[in-house]
């Protein structure tokens, strides 16, 4: 099964992300991390409202506040499902494409701790964004 990303937009706003662009962004993030996306299967990106991501953040991270992006690994046979990235465009400080890459990097095993700007993850994210934007 070739790597692909499904996009589910549950927002009332004008957030736009095509499955093709989401696939390109995630593929580039995984390749940057030395992973072979073609062996990974499927990933989903859900665009949600602030109250939805707030509930998820409370349930899974015990944080009683909305956030911009959450990533969830999905256990399953290798090559079927990688996980889900949940993004709240209304809570975002980064742009939508950066949040997709950010979520994919979390799924690849990266973390940034409390200081994102000083992290290796921030440097990798910047390289990926420069590559996909042709800079």
Curated annotation (Swiss-Prot):
Compartments where found: Cytoplasm
Protein's GO biological process: rRNA processing
GO cellular component: cytoplasm
Keywords annotated in UniProt: Cytoplasm, Endonuclease, Hydrolase, Metal-binding, Nuclease, Ribosome biogenesis, rRNA processing, Zinc
Function: Single strand-specific metallo-endoribonuclease involved in late-stage 70S ribosome quality control and in maturation of the 3' terminus of the 16S rRNA.
Recorded family membership: Belongs to the endoribonuclease YbeY family.
Protein name from the UniProt record: Endoribonuclease YbeY
Source organism of this protein record: Rubrobacter xylanophilus (strain DSM 9941 / JCM 11954 / NBRC 16129 / PRD-1)
């Amino acid at each position: 099964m070739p790597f692909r990303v499904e996009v589910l937009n549950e927002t009332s706003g004008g957030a736009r992300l095509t499955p093709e662009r989401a696939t390109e962004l995630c593929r580039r993030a995984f390749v940057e991390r030395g992973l072979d996306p073609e062996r990974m299967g499927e990933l989903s990106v859900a665009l949600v409202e602030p109250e939805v991501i707030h509930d998820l953040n409370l349930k899974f991270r015990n944080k009683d506040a909305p956030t911009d992006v959450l990533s969830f690994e999905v256990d399953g046979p290798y090559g079927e499902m990688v996980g889900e990235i949940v993004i709240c465009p209304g809570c975002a400080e980064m742009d939508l494409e950066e949040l997709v890459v950010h979520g994919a990097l979390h799924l690849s095993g990266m973390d940034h701790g409390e200081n994102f700007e000083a992290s290796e993850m921030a440097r990798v994210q910047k390289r990926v964004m420069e590559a996909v934007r042709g800079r």
